Regions:
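Active-site core of glycosidic bond-cleaving carbohydrate-active enzymes
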Residues: 1-200
């Protein structure tokens, strides 16, 4: 609890200048709520469940995506590349990649982003623009972990065939015995663990 209070999102529900931390702290808060629930600490559960939904504080309805806010709550100026700008409030990713990280409230994320059809179209577009070798890129960047859950979002959108299509394509083209056969740093086993789970 002390660590969450010290390093988590501020009282306004976000980490200044940072989309990555804001979304990841929200997920941490959701996990804390589940622990509190298991321990029978209803007050703590309610507190952390509420904090876990603060991802909406950094969603900009005007641009239609997540943007970093400064200490005063003002959105940072959009860069020329918009949500494709690596480092714009994100760690080793861009807002387009990082913005899908609301695993604890996918339905809420879908509503916030404009509904099922809009989200489905956006996800399809992301994968269709991804290079076939899955090396480092601005779209579905399998070379780095922030997007590893994204192909599975099609399941939550009622399109499991697209999860199957893209996970099979990734398994086939991002993992092989050539020079580019492992598209990213193994990072404590995440790349191979993803393959084992997705190929099953």
């Amino acid at each position: 609890l002390n660590t969450s209070r010290r390093f988590g999102n501020n009282d306004d529900g976000y980490t200044p200048g940072n989309i990555s931390c804001t979304l990841e702290y929200d997920y941490t808060d959701w996990c804390m709520a589940r622990l509190a629930e298991w321990l029978g600490k209803e007050g703590d559960r309610a507190h952390f469940d509420k904090r876990a939904l603060s991802y909406a504080t950094i969603f900009d309805p005007e641009s239609g995506w997540f943007r970093p806010r400064n200490e005063k709550g003002v959105f940072s100026s959009l860069p020329e590349k918009g949500r494709l700008q690596e480092g714009y409030g994100c760690v080793e990713s861009n807002p387009y990649q990082q913005g899908w990280f609301v695993p604890h409230d996918v339905e809420g994320m879908i509503r916030l982003m404009g509904g099922r059809e809009k989200v489905l179209a956006d996800l399809k577009d992301m994968f269709e623009k991804t290079p076939g070798d899955y090396l480092w890129n601005d779209y579905y960047n399998h070379a780095n972990e922030p997007v590893h859950h994204v192909p599975f979002l099609f399941n939550r959108l009622g399109m499991p065939s697209l999860t199957q299509k893209w996970t099979r394509d990734i398994c086939r083209n991002a993992y092989h015995d050539k020079v580019t056969g492992l598209v990213g740093n193994e990072d404590v086993g995440q790349m191979s663990a993803w393959y084992v789970l997705a190929a099953a």
